[in-house]
Amino acid sequence: KAFLRQPTGIGWKVQGKRWFWLAAWFGPAVLTLLGAVLYFAVFPSRLDFSGSWLVAAYGGEMDAQTLRSQLGVSTLSYLLQNGLFAVLLAPAINMFPALGEEVGWRGYMMPRLKERFGLLNGRLLGGVVWGVWHWPLMLLVGYEYGTDYLGAPLLGLVVWCVVCFALNTLLDILYEKTESIWVPAIAHGAFNAIAALPQVLVTPADAYYNVLGPMPIGLIAALPMLAAAVWLTLREMKQEEKN
């Protein structure tokens, strides 16, 4: 790859087909939506529009009706306002804090893992390494799923590695196809912006099931992202065999 021959080994140019930039910007929102729909299709009783999550988020001092009448905050308004911000503006903002991880994981680690272990094994190993990197925070402070959740702490550690494989693969594909580290940085920033939004649709008590969904870091809600990662990797492997 030409970008590996650059002095830093990282592709810094703003380049690549428009399709990949659009996929990076809007793809995480689409996958998050699909994951939430799948989760609530499996667990329809957990879909909650009462505003109980908002009540807890605002400190519990006002009930849902008071939040609507005095502050104009409802589940629908929260989803619309924060969803529009997360989709339209946040990827550009979050791109910069995400850039550091992208330089390290996708820019430096992934090309070398794929060169040594092959496409599929490299992406599998890269996802596990990225996931395990977060384990200390997960065990010490409840990063991602909290400390009291279904199957804690073992299930969360395993699920997080599955999620990291899926996300790492999609980010790696974006970098591979564009040779520009800015593209996966945008996608990473977009994912960080939108991922927590489905949580407003469950009660605080259902945070116990966060390891399953409705956020795309849950096993069930992550299935669309995982399916996309596996399908794209298998397609890429078939193309390599033909060549």
Model-derived features with residue positions:
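C-terminal membrane module of polytopic membrane proteins
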Residues: 147-156, 189-243
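Membrane-interface interhelical connector segments
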Residues: 62-70, 138-152
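Transmembrane alpha-helix/helix-exit interface in multi-pass inner-membrane proteins
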Residues: 36-48, 101-102, 123-143
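Residue-level signature of the transmembrane alpha-helical core
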Residues: 25-29, 87, 91, 95, ...
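Membrane-interface helix/loop boundary segments of multi-pass membrane proteins
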Residues: 99-132, 172-180
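Kinked, hydrophobic transmembrane alpha-helices enriched for aromatic residues
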Residues: 129-141, 184-203
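Hydrophobic alpha-helical transmembrane segments
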Residues: 64-94, 157-167, 214-223
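Membrane-helix interface linkers and caps
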Residues: 1-27, 38-61, 97, 112, ...
